[in-house]
Amino acid sequence: MKEFDTIAAIATNLGESGVSIIRVSGDKALSIVSSIFTGKNDRKLDDIRTYSMRYGFIIDKDTKEKLDEVIVSYMKGPRSFTAEDVVEINCHGGVVVTKRILEEVVAAGARLASPGEFTKRAFLNGRIDLSQAEAVIDLINAKTELSAKSALEQSEGKLSREIGKIRNKLLEIIASIEATVDYPEDDLEEVTSEKGRESVSKLLDEIDSLLDHADEGKILREGLNTVIVGKPNVGKSSLLNALLMETRAIVTDVPGTTRDVIEEYMSIDGIPIKIIDTAGIRDTDDVVEKIGVEKSREKINNSDLTVLVLDNSRGLDDEDKEIINFIKDKKYIVLLNKMDLESKIDKEALKELNSKYIIEISAKTGSGLDKFKEVIKELFFSGKVASKDVMITNTRHKEALIRAKESLEASKNALDNTFAIDLASIDLRNAWKSLGEINGDTVEEDIIDKIFSKFCLGK
């Protein structure tokens, strides 16, 4: 285990609440907190047992004034989250008292932790690997139960074990090839090449199996970026409100009411959907509305799915056609809204749209919305949302797997030529290194720092 100084931070949201927690980690954690703690009969924390709690007060070290009534818990390393001695002060929630206690902890010798530093220490101390550390923040940020389940499984090491198995198999192939290179025999080289090709083919199948559902995994982690577009007053905001089952956007008969982008999350059978309601796209002289229209175009360009809303009670006009032309190369669904009104739209003209999904809905009555949700599942999850044994949810992991696959394919080509068997060993080591980036064995330090910088304070 590495040696670090003792760090402290508020581990809960800072605000009015029932309880706040100040977390302290390091070899001096217990002595630091003990110096500002007084229990019943002036009892300190010197004799506290690991995995136990003690009632008392946090005091101002200089004035001996009581700051708050607390319960202190102690976990002796390495059997703690960071694999170090960890003390947690459970105090009353509230900004003033929580900050005041943290100030006393720092004054007593601790250093303020940087974002994600507790989890980073767990990684550097070998308690978790990098993919497990990333799963911690994914679990915190999960928007649906399915997202949370996927993150929890990764935090428990499911992906780590799978990657570890593949890397161990790679080492066996490398050892076999390098032994053949060191002790060359013509017939042995041929046998090694043949066995190596078979083994590499099996590993390629395993990596392909992991990559097969990576796009689905990314959606579970980040949400399906879904942009609602259309000209003003076709019912985009009404659709957003209907999907969320609450009044989130202002709805009026005045075109251009929505002038900015509104983003909210919803769940479709566990799929986190990031719904983005945009300003109606049209030519306008209004400066504020014009900014909203430009934002709408940006969101469309960065979307996973575009939802084009057309007004069934009116025919297609030039504004509709301009939007259709703008999104024609995107993956999009067409919603014919206001089906509760008389239909005036030209259905034949709609057949020319580059979308096989044209759904009749009424945002006002909710008619057709279930069909819309089923189509989203069909488009991105083949109609069924199922948790796979091991799900690749992180783009960084996907890219590492792709690099490993490319190296394995290169090694297979080298093994086809027994004269280049030593080159295969180089490619196999590159694949092993790429896979090691997933669990952190071979990743660069700046990437590690970047990953943990995305964490919140106290985690």
From Swiss-Prot:
One of its GO terms (biological process) is tRNA wobble uridine modification. (6S)-5-formyl-5,6,7,8-tetrahydrofolate binds at R23, E88, R127, K459. GO terms for cellular component: cytosol. It is an enzyme of class 3 (hydrolase). Residues 223-381 form the TrmE-type G domain. GTP binds at residues 233-238, 252-258, 277-280. Homodimer. Heterotetramer of two MnmE and two MnmG subunits. HAMAP family: GTPase_MnmE. Exhibits a very high intrinsic GTPase hydrolysis rate. Involved in the addition of a carboxymethylaminomethyl (cmnm) group at the wobble position (U34) of certain tRNAs, forming tRNA-cmnm(5)s(2)U34. This is tRNA modification GTPase MnmE. The gene is mnmE.
